[in-house]
Amino acid sequence: MNLIFQCRGGIGKAIMSTAIITAIKKQHPEYKIIVITSHPSVYRNNPDVHDIHTFENFQHLYYKYVYNQEFITYSLEPYEHSDFITGKKSLYEVWAELCNVKYDNEWPKFILTEDEIKKYSKLYKTDKPIFVLQTHGGNPNQNLDYNWARDLPNNTVEEIINHYKDDYN
């Protein structure tokens, strides 16, 4: 079964989607997962992903993965689900539910190559783990500096940074 998984949005959403891909692959190891995204590097080297395409180069997928084959496609928007908006469920729980799989606390996967590890480990010599926090995002063409449904309030960001600053770089 071919699963065409479309992930529209920013790099943060793409990274989060890898947790859902892991959940899908765990429950459906027979699926070949083909990702269409604006951020292909997020999925590179991920063993759960069979193939990666951008929205600019996916025209030939029809004959490769759809025509005369079993397939399903997910082009889902978990941010717009009422359970996420109201805080009843996490984004991961909502997304897994939309994909008809159980969410079992899977975490995002971002797999670096040995060359990348060698190159960047020289730049980040530290005795503490690195903490990355993406507080705001979105499409730069939307002209939205802040979006209540997407971005963390600045005072919350400050609290998070102050809480973790001694333990992380």
Predicted segments with their positions:
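Catalytic machinery of carbohydrate-active enzymes
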Residues: 1-169
